[in-house]
Amino acid sequence: MASMNFSPPEYPDYGTATLDPNIFVDESLNTPKLSVPDMIALVIFVMVFLVGVPGNFLVVWVTGFEVRRTINAIWFLNLAVADLLSCLALPILFSSIVQQGYWPFGNAACRILPSLILLNMYASILLLTTISADRFVLVFNPIWCQNYRGPQLAWAACSVAWAVALLLTVPSFIFRGVHTEYFPFWMTCGVDYSGVGVLVERGVAILRLLMGFLGPLVILSICYTFLLIRTWSRKATRSTKTLKVVVAVVVSFFVLWLPYQVTGMMMALFYKHSESFRRVSRLDSLCVAVAYINCCINPIIYVLAAQGFHSRFLKSLPARLRQVLAEESVGRDSKSITLSTVDTPAQKSQGV
């Protein structure tokens, strides 16, 4: 599923049998079984759905009340929306794997639902890059932030991130469709670049790798190297809460999406009928499932980062989320410059 390609299961060799769709097929010969990677993927999908839907809905609910006051809420609200959209598509993807890749949901669902995975990937990493840039400027240029950083700028940055994510998802939407075979009858959902050539397919895979993984990895590594050096050198404590949360979110993103990116690149480079391609494709659904863990892990990180979580979890989970997603002061030298998260000029010198 790095390209979300579902292949029909392996059936007995029918030799030179006709491809006439009206010919009788002995279905007793067709006894496909789920592979071990597919079964593991199904278990992961169930866990992600059960945790990701309520978890991200809770984050959306909590941050929805905070977006007018805090910029952090805007960042994490958009991240939660991206994750929630992907989680809501899980039942259909789950059903397709259970049916050995058979896709009965039509061409429109084939184009839209798997593309949500790529949209989530691009939106998440672009939003994380935006958040990281915000943290970088917040620490290294707090005066600029005090004057210009506000909800309107944050919403504009999120809008740009979503627009770019949609553009990067277009190739998946255009080249995706339902493929039908007649002996035996089988419908699969996947991408088909046969009309444009292998160079386009590899170009899309390289673009996905650069824009959805390597490029952001370089940018984020640079940002957080300087941020951590500054934090450690000045022994800041008040400004590290959100930094630690964002670092945890970023690290989990790259770890969980790495198998997806590797298999996607390998499937684009290997010849489609080679044994290497077949071996890698068997791990496809598992790699997507591992990447999907990213959709439910962020709310867990937010909650675990809240102070007093273990002792007060059952008392007020929304309060714990508000605590960890709140804005905080950023220390500079011996003075504490509190950065505004509201629009009104009078409040730009007040703590949040």
UniProtKB/Swiss-Prot annotation:
PROSITE patterns: G_PROTEIN_RECEP_F1_1, G_PROTEIN_RECEP_F1_2. Disulfide bonds join 110-189. It comes from the Eukaryota. The keyword DNA-binding does not apply. InterPro entries: Anphylx_rcpt_C3a/C5a1-2, Formyl_rcpt-rel, GPCR_Rhodpsn, GPCR_Rhodpsn_7TM. GO terms for cellular component: apical part of cell; basolateral plasma membrane; cytoplasmic vesicle; plasma membrane. Sulfation plays a critical role in the association of C5aR with C5a, but no significant role in the ability of the receptor to transduce a signal and mobilize calcium in response to a small peptide agonist. GO terms for molecular function: complement component C5a receptor activity; G protein-coupled receptor activity. Keywords: Cell membrane, Chemotaxis, Cytoplasmic vesicle, Disulfide bond, G-protein coupled receptor, Membrane, Phosphoprotein, Receptor, Sulfation, Transducer, Transmembrane, Transmembrane helix. It holds the Pfam family 7tm_1. The keyword Glycoprotein does not apply. Belongs to the G-protein coupled receptor 1 family. Receptor for the chemotactic and inflammatory peptide anaphylatoxin C5a. The ligand interacts with at least two sites on the receptor: a high-affinity site on the extracellular N-terminus, and a second site in the transmembrane region which activates downstream signaling events. Receptor activation stimulates chemotaxis, granule enzyme release, intracellular calcium release and superoxide anion production. This is C5a anaphylatoxin chemotactic receptor 1. It comes from Canis lupus familiaris. The gene is C5AR1.
